[in-house]
């Protein structure tokens, strides 16, 4: 096997997909070319570059988005401070104007007696006049009623007495006369009856005696006795027939009936006694009271009052509140200034760090690009350069260079979330870049800082408001209490003075009425009492003179006292009450007549209190003086909060738009990926069908098909016949950084079409076989050939013990330029490509690990392991790239196979020489073909070695030679060579 230095690339992937490179700045181990332009070039650069350098960036670093946000918030805070000053001035003016209005209101309240006195005096005068007129009318009606009642009573009782006495006397007399006559007749009849009764009784007694004596005679007649009955003589009694009543009784009654009085004289005298005083009294009352008028001008009128108290207002709490609000804004500005200084320092440090990262990223990107471009040009792969200079790659490079922190955060974020695909990482990076755009950050920083400042100001204002509200409220509460007391004193003094004067006038009028008008009532009632007494006395005298000495005198006196005496006593009591209450008693004016009640005072002084104190709310504010200041300041803060909240809302909208864009991109790429997979699957099926057709249609196609169908399976058991233990893998350089995702597609791999995958026994072999290739089946047991080292330093020579086989391998006349793959890594027919400058090799992965990673199985110990495990082949390093250290170097090497020789359990794809005409000698038959042995024919070239000796591996026969120098022959490049990657 010989080294072929025309391909440098990463090992191929077993997945059928395009290999995506990681961000360019991760390639941090490749140094730039010495001939390229560098920032540290010894040539003196111009003073001003077309881009901003470190000094310019450090100069502009303080002017950052957070600083602008802080300045905006500071401007709003300064505006709030000015607003607080204006609010304090406005509050003072409002307080003074409210105090002036309160003085006017208090003066008006204190002058209420002056305004109330005029109307009160008129009303008092009218009430007194109406009272007097009403009293006169009542007295007139009362006197008339009493007069008529007395007259009616007198007439009634007079007629009653006359009729009753006539009825009584005349009826009694008639009864007596009739009674006398009946008594006389009764007495006469009685006497006659008595006479007859007596006579009949005596006759009966005589009869009884005769009967009794006869009975006795009958009894005693037996004895012969005989008694004579006694006999009583019957008297005549003639005197009883002439008994009668005396005639004087009847004569006296008849005489009394003829002499009864008529009481006409008593009636006339009583009428004269009743009508005369009543008529006189009514005439006097009407003449005096009917024309009575009370003059209201005699009542006093209090003077107007002027109340002043504004000079007692203490506005120092307002000044203290204004100073406190200014201090809040001042300390807020100081805090913002300190934060701004910190932000400026952080901005300077950030710009310096970003500059360093950007410079390093540019250097690493340039070095990597130059190295990859040289490799691509050496392989003739211009498409690789085009991929590097694509707009997407350049934009990614600029973004990563300008925003290293965003890229760092994006990578860490993806790493923690387990995001491994490149497109998902790109979407995360795009979202962070979208959210970290200066416009978005300006909205976010300004909104957050503004809300924090508004919140802090609101907390401080609330804490200050409770203290100063209580202070100013206490001061104004004392002032309002003084105002209330002052108004109360003024109104009380005015009311007392007014009531005293008014009562004096009212009492004077009352005395005049009682002395000049109602004294006649006293006279009239006394006269009426005398009249009634005279009437009763006259009636008694009349009855005494009439019935004196008769049995009717006492009953009539009792009757008159019962019927008339009680009524007269009641009338006398009424007249006595009138006499005792016949006077005017006007109500005097109270001392608080012009004073307001407590609820009226509160209603009048409420505007004054509210103008000073305002209506308090639960948060310490209100519409008072302090409440006005606090409310204006809080209203200003509320407007700022709305502004800053709107800015945060704008950032939230930006976030939502970014998430929607990422979601849309994810769904769209997933749909596109599914479509690509479908198309690739269809294309792969078609290619496989075409491959099978080509393999069957070409020369010897049937034999190839049969050979492929009967080819033994690849497994690790073919290496078990060798007991050589594997050589340990060389240690890796601890300073080297491996990033497989950062490797670009190989030039050889990217220049040929997509490989075709043919699945064979669970191992995928990407390859392209020329239709002229033909293999024959082999029935020999397949074993790997041990790898031996040769001493020939020439890498273009091949050592073999069987000259027929080596001659056969060197005299192949057919030469193809098709790129074909063998096994599972990028292999092609060696076509004598131009060499490329060598890269410094670095042991990265051992043969066993590499084999396990490529083929999915472990490598058994074999003779080839001991020589292959430590083999590092490298081309000679050119002088112009001697100082370039390449990490993870890969080199293409060449495998020379003879026709129909074994290789990893299968036959070589190299067809027999065309000159043999398809006939096979016994040496080349399946039963006689020797195994191929891979030997080393050169030394290892290190990255800094000046030795030009190189190593070459070649297949030899199964029979080993004794140790020592072996004959070698010059390797002839032929179509029977397969190039593959080794590292």
Swiss-Prot record:
Transmembrane segments: 58-78, 160-180, 333-353, 441-461, 642-662
Glycosylation sites: 35, 242, 257, 286, 295, 306, 493, 529, 585
Record's compositionally biased regions (Basic and acidic residues): 674-693, 751-760
Domain of life assignment: Eukaryota
Residue stretches of biased makeup (Polar residues): 798-813, 945-955, 967-976
Family per record: Belongs to the PRM1 family.
Protein name: Plasma membrane fusion protein PRM1
Organism per entry: Mycosarcoma maydis
Gene: PRM1
């Amino acid at each position: 096997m010989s080294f072929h230095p025309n391909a440098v690339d990463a090992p191929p992937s077993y997945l059928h997909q395009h290999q995506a490179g990681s961000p360019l700045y991760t390639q941090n181990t490749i140094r730039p070319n010495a001939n390229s332009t560098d920032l540290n070039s010894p040539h003196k650069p111009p003073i001003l570059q077309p881009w901003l350098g470190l000094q310019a960036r450090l100069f502009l670093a303080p002017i950052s988005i957070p600083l602008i946000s802080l300045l905006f918030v500071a401007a709003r805070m300064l505006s709030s401070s000015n607003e607080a000053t204006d609010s304090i001035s406005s509050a003072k003016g409002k307080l003074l104007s409210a105090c002036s209005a309160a003085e006017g209101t208090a003066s008006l309240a204190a002058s209420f007696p002056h305004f109330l006195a005029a109307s009160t005096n008129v009303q008092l005068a009218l009430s007194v006049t109406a009272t007097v007129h009403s009293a006169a009318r009542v007295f007139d009606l009362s006197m008339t009623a009493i007069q008529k009642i007395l007259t009616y009573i007198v007439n009634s009782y007079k007629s009653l007495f006359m009729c009753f006495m006539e009825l009584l006397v005349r009826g009694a007399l008639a009864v007596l006369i009739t009674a006398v006559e009946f008594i006389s007749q009764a007495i006469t009849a009685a006497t006659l009856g008595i006479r007859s009764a007596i006579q009949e009784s005596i006759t009966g007694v005589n009869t009884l005696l005769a009967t009794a004596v006869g009975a006795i005679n009958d009894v005693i007649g037996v004895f012969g006795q005989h008694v004579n009955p006694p006999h009583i003589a019957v008297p005549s009694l003639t005197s009883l027939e002439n008994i009668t009543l005396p005639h004087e009784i009847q004569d006296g009654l008849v005489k009394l009936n003829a002499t009864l009085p008529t009481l006409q004289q008593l009636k006339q005298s009583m009428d004269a006694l009743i009508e005369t005083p009543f008529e006189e009294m009514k005439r006097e009352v009407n003449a005096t009271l009917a024309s009575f008028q009370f003059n209201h001008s005699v009542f006093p009128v209090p003077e107007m009052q002027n109340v002043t108290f504004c000079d007692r207002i203490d506005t120092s709490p307002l000044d203290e509140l204004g100073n406190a609000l200014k201090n809040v804004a001042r300390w807020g500005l100081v805090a913002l200034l300190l934060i701004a200084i910190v932000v400026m320092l952080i901005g300077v440090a950030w710009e310096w760090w970003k500059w360093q990262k950007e410079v390093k990223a540019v250097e690493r990107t340039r070095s990597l690009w130059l190295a990859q471009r040289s490799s691509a040009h050496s392989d003739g792969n211009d498409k690789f350069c085009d991929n590097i200079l694509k707009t997407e790659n350049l934009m990614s490079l600029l973004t990563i260079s300008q925003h290293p922190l965003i890229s760092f955060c994006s990578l860490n974020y993806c790493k923690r979330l387990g995001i491994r695909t490149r497109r998902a990482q790109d979407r995360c990076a795009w979202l962070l870049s979208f959210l970290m755009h200066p416009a978005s950050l300006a909205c976010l920083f300004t909104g957050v800082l503004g809300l924090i400042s508004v919140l802090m100001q609101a907390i401080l204002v609330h804490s200050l408001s409770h203290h100063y509200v209580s202070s100013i409220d206490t001061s104004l509460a004392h002032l309002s209490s003084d105002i209330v007391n002052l108004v109360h004193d003024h109104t009380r003094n005015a009311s007392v003075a007014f009531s005293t004067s008014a009562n004096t006038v009212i009492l004077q009028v009352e005395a005049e009425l009682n002395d000049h008008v109602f004294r006649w009532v006293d006279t009239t009632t006394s006269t009426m009492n005398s009249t009634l007494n005279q009437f009763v006395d006259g009636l008694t005298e009349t009855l005494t003179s009439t019935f004196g000495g008769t049995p009717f005198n006492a009953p009539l006196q009792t009757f008159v006292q019962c019927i008339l005496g009680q009524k007269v006593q009641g009338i006398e009591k009424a007249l006595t009450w009138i006499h005792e209450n016949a006077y005017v008693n006007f109500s005097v004016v109270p001392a608080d007549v012009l004073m307001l009640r407590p609820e009226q005072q509160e209603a009048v002084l409420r505007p004054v209190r509210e103008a000073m104190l305002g209506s308090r709310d639960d948060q310490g504010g209100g519409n008072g003086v302090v409440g006005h200041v606090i409310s204006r300041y809080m209203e200003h803060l509320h407007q700022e909060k709305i502004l800053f909240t709107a800015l945060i809302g704008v950032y939230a909208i930006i976030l939502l738009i970014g998430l929607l864009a990422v979601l849309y991109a994810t769904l769209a790429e997933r749909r596109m990926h599914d479509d690509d997979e479908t198309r690739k699957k269809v294309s792969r099926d078609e290619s496989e069908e075409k491959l099978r057709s080509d393999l069957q249609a070409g020369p010897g196609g049937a034999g190839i098909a049969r050979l492929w169908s009967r080819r033994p399976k690849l497994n690790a058991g073919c290496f078990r016949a060798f007991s050589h233990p594997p050589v340990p893998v060389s240690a890796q350089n601890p300073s080297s950084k491996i990033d497989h995702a950062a490797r670009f597609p190989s030039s050889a791999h990217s220049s040929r079409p997509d490989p075709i995958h043919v699945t064979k026994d669970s191992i995928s072999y990407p390859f392209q076989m020329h239709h002229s290739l033909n293999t024959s089946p082999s029935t020999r047991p397949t074993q790997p050939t041990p790898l031996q080292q040769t001493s020939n330093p020439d890498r273009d020579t091949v050592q073999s013990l069987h000259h027929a086989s080596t001659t056969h391998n060197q005299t192949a006349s057919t030469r193809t330029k098709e790129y074909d793959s063998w096994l599972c890594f990028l292999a092609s027919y060696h076509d004598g490509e131009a060499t490329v400058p060598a890269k410094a090799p670095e042991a990265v992965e051992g043969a066993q690990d590499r084999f396990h990673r490529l083929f999915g199985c472990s490598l058994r110990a074999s003779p080839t392991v001991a020589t292959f495990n430590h083999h590092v082949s490298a081309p000679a390093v050119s002088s112009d790239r001697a100082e370039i250290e390449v990490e993870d170097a890969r080199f293409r090497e060449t495998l020379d196979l003879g026709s129909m020789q074994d290789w990893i359990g299968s036959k070589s794809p190299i067809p027999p020489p065309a000159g043999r005409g398809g006939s096979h000698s016994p040496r080349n038959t399946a039963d006689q073909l020797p195994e191929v042995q891979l030997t080393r024919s050169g030394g290892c070239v290190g990255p800094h070695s000046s030795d030009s000796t190189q190593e070459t591996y070649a297949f030899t026969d199964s029979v080993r030679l004794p140790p020592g120098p072996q004959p070698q022959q010059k390797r002839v490049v032929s179509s029977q060579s397969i190039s593959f990657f080794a590292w």
